[in-house]
């Protein structure tokens, strides 16, 4: 574990009572957070407006000179409450679709990492690199049992091996599964890809800062579903090349 060896502790992990996103490390996740914040601003305005209208109606209902039982039709208000929500939904949907398609784009990846989900661990393969035996770099990653955890390691998140990636590099993740449906999800990187048997799904990531990033399988896949974490160490290009030479 390169970052631990260098006494560098940069972990992006869930926090107790956390109600917001983890710090973003990719443009995709930055876009997701920005879209969420912008939409939430307008949703709060809508909530306050609707709440005020409801409160006013209930408060002043007894003073209304026109009893509601005689009001059976109101074309103007019906047009307003039909068109206005539709316009709001379109305004929300337009940037959402743009971000969705941008997140699906894989732009000239410099390297590819394959992630295969199995019950209940992950297998990784660096298909662009070959070791001294003429084989691609491949390893399996298992969760560290609670009784074997060392100081600083996280329960149900730390693994015996880590995916090591260089910083500021376009990386393509190809995700699949060998048995049942899993889900490759790393919140800080804005990655969440379904791992389906017999199908290859892909996503790209440009990780912009060094650190240790954790994720969990986000698809119920059996009794040990909670024991399928993923751990990614992002290091400098020099440290990544050193790690490659050791494989």
Curated annotation (Swiss-Prot):
Mg(2+) binds at residue 219. It comes from the Eukaryota. Residues 12-38, 102-247 are mitochondrial intermembrane. It comes from Cyberlindnera saturnus (Yeast). Belongs to the cytochrome c oxidase subunit 2 family. It catalyses: 4 Fe(II)-[cytochrome c] + O2 + 8 H(+)(in) = 4 Fe(III)-[cytochrome c] + 2 H2O + 4 H(+)(out). Its EC number is 7.1.1.9. CDD domains: CcO_II_C (cd13912). The gene is COX2. It is found in: Mitochondrion inner membrane. InterPro entries: CcO_II, CcO_II-like_C, CcO_II_C, Copper_CuA, Cupredoxin, Cyt_c_oxidase_su2_TM_dom, Cyt_c_oxidase_su2_TM_sf. The chain crosses the membrane at residues 39-59, 79-101. One of its GO terms (cellular component) is mitochondrial inner membrane. SUPFAM superfamilies: Cupredoxins (SSF49503), Cytochrome c oxidase subunit II-like, transmembrane region (SSF81464). Cu cation A2 binds at residues 217, 219, 221, 225. Component of the cytochrome c oxidase (complex IV, CIV), a multisubunit enzyme composed of a catalytic core of 3 subunits and several supernumerary subunits. The complex exists as a monomer or a dimer and forms supercomplexes (SCs) in the inner mitochondrial membrane with ubiquinol-cytochrome c oxidoreductase (cytochrome b-c1 complex, complex III, CIII). Binds a dinuclear copper A center per subunit. Component of the cytochrome c oxidase, the last enzyme in the mitochondrial electron transport chain which drives oxidative phosphorylation. The respiratory chain contains 3 multisubunit complexes succinate dehydrogenase (complex II, CII), ubiquinol-cytochrome c oxidoreductase (cytochrome b-c1 complex, complex III, CIII) and cytochrome c oxidase (complex IV, CIV), that cooperate to transfer electrons derived from NADH and succinate to molecular oxygen, creating an electrochemical gradient over the inner membrane that drives transmembrane transport and the ATP synthase. It is a multi-pass membrane protein. Pfam families: COX2, COX2_TM. Keywords: Copper, Electron transport, Magnesium, Membrane, Metal-binding, Mitochondrion, Mitochondrion inner membrane, Respiratory chain, Translocase, Transmembrane, Transmembrane helix, Transport. One of its GO terms (biological process) is ATP synthesis coupled electron transport. Residues 60-78 are mitochondrial matrix. The signal sequence of COX2 is processed by IMP1. It is an enzyme of class 7 (translocase). This is Cytochrome c oxidase subunit 2.
